[in-house]
C-alpha cells in the first residue's frame, strides 16, 4: 500500500463531531467528486471515487446531514484493476448545492464553496481534510518530499490556497494541462499539513523515515568528506616522498639542515601518516603547520634542483 493511500485511509476514519465540520468536509467532496445530472426532470448529484473507505465516509456524512443516497459499484474490468464507487443523491440536490454556494438563487453555477462553511478553524481543518482525501497525493518520505492537491478548477484552487495561507503554508499553484494543482516540497510544512488535517499516525511515520533519511545523508556526507580528505592526504604524501627521493638522489639528505633531514626520513619511514601524526613523532613535537612548513622547504629545494639552480 502506498504512503498516500495509508494516509487517506487513516483520515477516512475521522468523522468530525461537530455538524458544522461535517458539512465543511462534505462540501469539499461535493465540489471535487460531484457530477450533476438530470433524472426525472430533477437534479441528480453523483459522487465518484475509487476508494471504498472514502465512499463509506461520504455515505456517513450525507446520512448524518439528512440526505438519502444510493450506492453503485462499477467494475471497470481487468485493465483498470479497480472498482469505482458512485454515491447518488436524488432528493433535495438543489437545496444541497444552494446551501454550499455552488448554485445561487438564480440557479447559476459557482466554483466556490460558501465562505460561511470555512470561517471557523475547526471547519477549515475538516474542509482541507476533504480536499486532500478527494484530490491529494503524497510521496513516500523515503523519496522526494512532495505533497499535492489536485483541484477541479482555478477559482476553487484559489479559494483553497487562501484557506491554506491562513496557516502560513507556502503551496505553489501550477497547472498540469488545464487542471490546477497546489503543491509543497518542504518536509516541515508537509508535517504541519498532516498535523492540521489530523493524520497523526502518518505524521509519525513520515517523521521517523525523514530522521533516518537525514541521518543516513549526513553519514554519507561525512564519509564522502573523509574520503576526499584521505585522497588529498595520500596525493600530498606521494608528492612529498617523490621530492625527498629526488633530493636524496641528487644531493643526498645529509646535505640538508638537520630539521629538514629529520622530517624527510620520518616521512620515508611513515608514508601513510598525516602531518599532525608526523609532528607528534618529533622531539619536541611539532604542530601540523610547522610540519607543513618544513615540507614546503623541501619542495622548494627539489624545485631548485630540477631547475638547475641547486646541485
UniProtKB/Swiss-Prot annotation:
Any one Pfam family match given in the protein's UniProt record, by short name: WhiA_N
GO molecular function: DNA binding
Positions of the DNA-binding region: 274-307
The UniProt record lists the keyword Thylakoid: no
Biological process annotations from GO: cell division; regulation of sporulation
InterPro entries assigned: Homing_endonucl, Sporu_reg_WhiA_N_dom, Sporulation_regulator_WhiA, Sporulation_regulator_WhiA_C, WhiA_LAGLIDADG_dom
Key words, A-Z: Cell cycle, Cell division, DNA-binding
Family, similarity comment: Belongs to the WhiA family.
Alphabetical list of PANTHER family matching this protein: CELL DIVISION PROTEIN WHIA-RELATED
Function: Involved in cell division and chromosome segregation.
Name of the protein described by the UniProt record: Probable cell division protein WhiA
Organism from which the protein derives: Carboxydothermus hydrogenoformans (strain ATCC BAA-161 / DSM 6008 / Z-2901)
Organism taxonomic ancestry: Bacteria, Bacillati, Bacillota, Clostridia, Thermoanaerobacterales
Amino acid at each position: 500500500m502506498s504512503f498516500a493511500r495509508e494516509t487517506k485511509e487513516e483520515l477516512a476514519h475521522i468523522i468530525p463531531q461537530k455538524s458544522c465540520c461535517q458539512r465543511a468536509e462534505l462540501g469539499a467532496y461535493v465540489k471535487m467528486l460531484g457530477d450533476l445530472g438530470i433524472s426525472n426532470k430533477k437534479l441528480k448529484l453523483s459522487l465518484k471515487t475509487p476508494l471504498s473507505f472514502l465512499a463509506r465516509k461520504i455515505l456517513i456524512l450525507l446520512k448524518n446531514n439528512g440526505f438519502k443516497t444510493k450506492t453503485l459499484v462499477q467494475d471497470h474490468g481487468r485493465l483498470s484493476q479497480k472498482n469505482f464507487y458512485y454515491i447518488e443523491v436524488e432528493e433535495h440536490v438543489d437545496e444541497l448545492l444552494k446551501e454550499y454556494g455552488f448554485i445561487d438563487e438564480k440557479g447559476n453555477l459557482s466554483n466556490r464553496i460558501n465562505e460561511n462553511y470555512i470561517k471557523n478553524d475547526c471547519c477549515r481543518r475538516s474542509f482541507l481534510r476533504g480536499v486532500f482525501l478527494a484530490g491529494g497525493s503524497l510521496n513516500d518520505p523515503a523519496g522526494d518530499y512532495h505533497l499535492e492537491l489536485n483541484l477541479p478548477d482555478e477559482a476553487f484552487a484559489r479559494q483553497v490556497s487562501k484557506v491554506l495561507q491562513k496557516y502560513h503554508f507556502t503551496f505553489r499553484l501550477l497547472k498540469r494541462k488545464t487542471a490546477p494543482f497546489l503543491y509543497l516540497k518542504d518536509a516541515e510544512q508537509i508535517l504541519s499539513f498532516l498535523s492540521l488535517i489530523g493524520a497523526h499516525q502518518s505524521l509519525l511515520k513520515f517523521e521517523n523515515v525523514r530522521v533516518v533519511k537525514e541521518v543516513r545523508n549526513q553519514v554519507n556526507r561525512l564519509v564522502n568528506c573523509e574520503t576526499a580528505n584521505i585522497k588529498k592526504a595520500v596525493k600530498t604524501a606521494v608528492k612529498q616522498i617523490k621530492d625527498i627521493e629526488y633530493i636524496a638522489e641528487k644531493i643526498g639528505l645529509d646535505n640538508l639542515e638537520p630539521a629538514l633531514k629529520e622530517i624527510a626520513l620520518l616521512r620515508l619511514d611513515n608514508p601513510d601518516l598525516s602531518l599532525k601524526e608526523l609532528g607528534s613523532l618529533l622531539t619536541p613535537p611539532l604542530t601540523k603547520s610547522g610540519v607543513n612548513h618544513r615540507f614546503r622547504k623541501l619542495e622548494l629545494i627539489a624545485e631548485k634542483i630540477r631547475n638547475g639552480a641547486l646541485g
